[in-house]
A protein has these predicted regions:
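RNA pseudouridine synthases
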Residues: 2-176
């Protein structure tokens, strides 16, 4: 996603690109993300529901819990740290749908901090005078994008066949 920081993989050759694409298709690539989400996420959990284009706005995705539209999507999440009005979580994807983490977290009432497409900026723009209002305005100045990091990426090397695992640190704007 645009404005997501962290790791990504590219195939340098057609062979590598094809091999990596197959690994993503077969869901053997390990991907974990860190996200700051609104609210106190009380428990670790799993969000499961079809994800597809929203009926009212075709530029965003929506969750269809009965599976009437979209494609099957599963996101596992665990709480890393509670930080007042936001919670730092880790997400592990079983599937890889467009905006999957963003739409799944919105669906369970915990949109990503700073995500205007999925309700992550409403806490400031929609609640003037709130308890954390000045603090949050400063946070939006420091982190003017969705708080989502591609934290770990693991896959089999296309030529050597060995499993490779990469890890990235939280960017400075998410640490502040």
């Amino acid at each position: 996603d645009k404005d997501t920081t962290g790791l990504m993989v590219l195939g340098k050759t057609e062979f590598s690109l094809t091999d990596l694409s197959e690994q993503f298709f077969e869901r053997t690539v390990e991907r974990r993300y860190h996200a700051l989400v609104w609210g106190d996420v009380s428990e670790d959990g799993t969000v499961e529901g079809h994800v597809g284009r929203a009926r009212q706005n075709r530029t965003v995705q929506a969750v269809y819990p009965e599976g009437e539209e979209g494609k099957h999507a599963v996101t596992h999440y665990r709480v890393i740290e509670r930080l007042g009005p936001v919670t730092l979580i880790e997400c592990k994807l079983e599937t890889g749908r467009t905006h999957q983490i963003r739409v799944h977290m919105q669906y369970i009432g915990h949109p990503l901090f700073g995500d205007p497409r999925y309700g992550g900026n409403v806490a400031v723009t929609g609640s003037p005078g709130g308890k954390y209002n000045n603090f949050l305005r400063n946070c939006f100045d420091i982190l003017p994008r969705q708080a989502l990091l591609a934290k770990t990426l693991g896959f089999k090397h296309p030529k050597k066949g060995e499993f490779m695992n990469f890890d990235s640190d939280l960017p400075s704007d998410m640490v502040e």
